[in-house]
Amino acid sequence: MVEAIAAVTRHVRLLGPWTSWVCLGVLAVVVALLWWTRTRHLPPLRQAAVPAAALVVTAVAWLIVEVIWHPVAEGAGTAVWAWTGGVVLVACQILLGGGPAAGADPATGGDSAAGGDSAAARERARARHPRLARMAGSGTGLAAALAAALLAINAFFGAYPSLAAVLGLGVPTTPLDSLPAAAPLPRAPERGAGPLLANWTAPSDLPAEGAVVTATVPAGDQSGTRGFKPRQAVIYLPPAYLTAQRPALPVLVLMAGQPGSPRDWFEIGRLKETMDAYAAAHGGLAPVVVVVDPLGSPYRNPLCSDTPRGGRAATYLQQDVPTWITTHLQVDPDRSHWAIAGLSNGGTCALQVVTRAPESYRTFLAMSPEEHPTLGGEQRTINRGFGGDRAAYEANDPLSLMAAAPPGRYDGVAGLISIGAQDEEYASAVPALVNGARDAGIEVDTRQYEGGHGWAVWSAALADEVDWLGERLGLV
């Protein structure tokens, strides 16, 4: 049943050059119809009160979400709030509007000639527009406006490509435990000298594509904190990993941004397609990609740090995740063949991990990273994220860590920092991070891709940077 639903919903495409314009047209039609049926009969002041109420409600919602709650450091964005305002306008039309005014002829909208005619007119109006029909029409209009807004916002960020992706059915997954073991114990396969590809001959049982599996990668001791509870990890296993004699494959630990989840890299970021294409060109070899959760919730930001408020997120990424990988997966244990990467908040986190613990990962990909870990402003971050402790903040800030690093601290560390060509908000962070990294002895380069702060950039970045990554991790 699930497979049938997935097969059908994969064909329901949500992205295209027409999406935003069609959604705008739908919203305009809904607003116009509701004006015609519910608000044009109102007195002028009451008509003006409808958009005014929508503006006030939207402003209050913005204040609560962006100022008081502030779940996402960079905010939801103008596009999100513009579409939210459109949906609120439709709701206000429904709640504050009415049908033809008492004393008006429903057919003409004009005044009736006599009071007796007025009663008859009201009866005719009730007959023509029964309450249930009006409720159904209003509900349909609100649903259409909401659907249009969600589709338009999705298109703006270049997010879910299909309905299957929204439902989490775009990429089939199986539990890791369901895979057959290639050896009696989860030991690391041996690896010869030189690039892995030079010592590898693809066996006859090599699958045509990799597998996507899920697993729980638990956090360790969280005593003394509010606790960090990561969501389930999603793992890409390349074709070579699925053979009877697994080679010693390198590891890429990958993170999404906020709000986001590990599945986003598969449902939106085309990770499997990218890695399958790389593997097809390299005899089935590709990194084992473990997409982990650095947040615990789409709307919680533990700042990739060990704090009483956020739990031990840093320890999770630097110790718990590597320990779990070497215990449960048959991979190359050499950390010089491991990398960590992420986008936006996850890109910042990748930089934090590398600058705090370069012994854990020697390679990084930071896609559209923030200049500093943030909850929306430096002082707010220090106060809310680190209990007012500036020293704790600086101990988790990549620029501060790199500036204070002794010579040789980052020997052998290298990475790429990438950005969207139209990402004006995050572009200013790149020069500061690059200069700070180079001054600290980190080998770093930058890459730019067409687009803003969205998945069009991040999926393109991964597809482009995987060749550099494969060479860096000793695959080729």
Q: Where do the protein language model's features map onto the residues?
A:
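Non-catalytic cap/lid and distal C-terminal segments of serine-dependent acyl enzymes
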Residues: 1-104, 116-476
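Short linear segments in intrinsically disordered or otherwise low-structure-confidence regions
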Residues: 108-109, 114-115
